[in-house]
């Protein structure tokens, strides 16, 4: 048995759950006219409403006791202090330093990292402004019209999500594209229609050895060189890396290499040089506004008492829903089309961080950790998987996200969008009783056996937990707040679960086996070095390829 489930604070929550299993949220609202104000928090122009959860004041008090028992404040402070809280890799966790706007020193092993951060930011400012203004010329003397970011994982998902979310702030005439998949289709389709003379490639790989990224980078290089010659590489490629030797060997001028550090995890790296495509797309001031929003949430997280600390409260609500109410998944549902890549970004941020079954001291857990995260923009999801959220046997907590102001005030579109945003959380909470269904069916002219046969199908149990996040408008600043809110939520949950959210050993085994299999695919003859299924699949592939 792990120590977490033996804690008196954990067992007190278990007892509290048993005593309150029959609690209905609609009754809690009826009993407390101030429930919304009691269970909501605002930070700047971001409102977080968690009142539509199966919680009472006692639930929150007991969850906060658990957070204190797991030293959530201490782990938070150690992270901000630059201590090596990523123990398995012996590294500090300092994405917060990248957006530190206070000017105060942040140290790793006694060294203030802020001068190096500011130096790279200045380099990014100069380069992004040169590209945006047209001062940066390609080999033929033309300005850049298309930027292609080549990366994968954290070198792709964050920049893609932010660039899509901030499309209203993009510079006209300058397009940003992203290639991540080693499937040649991704690169081939991206290059279609691009003009080599006006295309800039950003190769994002800390080690400059990532298989997928370097495969795509060499394909892009071949495409460019075939049209413009070898000398063009220096004008049309830049690198986000720390491996100057490999960058230079590729043909990239190391003056155009943007560094970052091993205390920046990939899934937290959009704030670093990895964010260069963001700075080019929305301008460096927009990139800094993104940092400003994140910094505001950082300071709130760092200084607010636990009971009014938005990331802490959000994390504890998740602990309650997953570890005590039994939810295994979690939906992120942005009612904003610009946020259509948010769920994909958060899948990596959350599932790669907290998808662990071993604690920091190497013991197997006997409780659930990170949930399966999924999502789609509203209202698309309503016509897809919301049926399961409303009426299935599974409990699926959800975050609903929306902005009061739209960037595209077309007719009454936004009012209709937001009416669905508000309606869905109400429906999930209140449900619909059999008596209400009968009344509706009778009003529609249905009676007797036909009515009774339909009633069970139209009943909604309700009592489904949701959070609502409402911002005034999605800007670089408020997007920065939102991202940092999720980052710190993930951190707190990892600390409560006693796991390390900052390593990702689970991605290594498949990569190791792929390296072994790759030469087998081109070696003549059948393969017999794996299990029966894998051998059969490889040999079938080779037979079809040989036809």
UniProtKB/Swiss-Prot annotation:
Gene Ontology CC: one annotated term: cytosol
Taxonomy, superkingdom: Bacteria
Organism of provenance: Magnetococcus marinus (strain ATCC BAA-1437 / JCM 17883 / MC-1)
Keywords: Cytoplasm, Gluconeogenesis, Glycolysis, Isomerase
GO molecular function terms attached to this record: carbohydrate derivative binding; glucose-6-phosphate isomerase activity; monosaccharide binding
Catalytic residues as annotated in Swiss-Prot or TrEMBL: 352, 383, 511
EC number in record: 5.3.1.9
Protein name: Glucose-6-phosphate isomerase
Gene name of the record: pgi
SUPFAM superfamilies: SIS domain
Uppermost EC category: isomerase
Entry-linked Pfam families: PGI (PF00342)
